[in-house]
Each structure stands twice: as structure tokens, then as C-alpha cells.
Amino acid sequence: MELMQAKMPLRGEVKIPGDKSISHRAVMFGALADGTTRVTNFLQGADCLSTISCFRKLGIDIENTQEEIRIHGKGLHGLTAPTEILDTGNSGTTTRLISGILAGQNFTTTLTGDASVQSRPMGRIIKPLSMMGATVESLKGNQCAPLQIQGHPLTAIHYQSPVASAQVKSCVLLAGLYAD
């Protein structure tokens, strides 16, 4: 092995691509915060844009440019009932995570998605959200989307998911924000 000495120090700037998981959660936490949240390096992919679309339909003002997004949050209880079905597109992450938030609202919401989302298992979130006090129904009766979520005051639970899933954990943790 030969060790070579650098002739000059390494300098530069590296821009890391946006992260899908962080981008989804940034929108959600920004919407639930009081005031404006500024997010740079947001991943402008279809799944993350579905999350933005859903929160706009829940009454959250979100400005989106290529440089940043600004989310004008209204606090934990500031979401408003949507006037239409929330379409999560092809985003299972949006579907599962937003379900935890909707479970603690004082209104009913219907979530749907594309054919792929409608074939993905949602029983893994229906069970804990129901245990917490929400009414969550698979409208096709197959434990998949579309889901109708009637929010209620929630109760804290001890829950061990039978599947290892960051989405299930995040869903339950987000619902926990509304639990007594």
C-alpha cells in the first residue's frame, strides 16, 4: 500500500439529495407545529408531493419552490375537515402516517390511493388506531385502502407490532400526540 500526501486541502461543497422518509415527516410535523416551518432539500418526488397535497386539503398552507418548502402550521388541533377524499397516490407512507394524525381529529376523513396502495395491508395500522379509540374502516372490507377514519379522543396504549415497520411505529407515535 502506498500512502499519497494531498498537495492541497480538499475543499468543496456537496449537496446531499433529499430523503423521502425525512421529507414526509417534515411536512407532517410542520403542519402540526404552530407557525412557519422552513424545509430545505425537500425531496420533490411523487410520494412526498402526495403528502403536501393531503395537508393542503386539510387546510395547511404550503409554499413549494425548488429551493425550499414553507409549511404554515396550525398546531395539533388546527387541521380542518377536507371537502374531498384524500388521495395519497402511490404513497403507502403518506397513507399510513397521516392515518395516525387523522385518528385524533374531530372529523371523518376518507383516504384512498392508486391500485398499488389499495392492495397494501393496512390492518397493521387499523388495529392499533382502533385500540386507541379511533374508528378506522377499510371500505372494501379487505384491510386495505380506501380507509374511512373517524377521529376520536385517543387513549394511550402499549402496543407491540407483529411486523417490523417504521411506518407502523410512526403512525402510532403520531396518533400518540393526541392521546391522553
Language-model segments: residues:
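Structural preference for solvent-exposed beta-strand-turn elements
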Residues: M1-D180
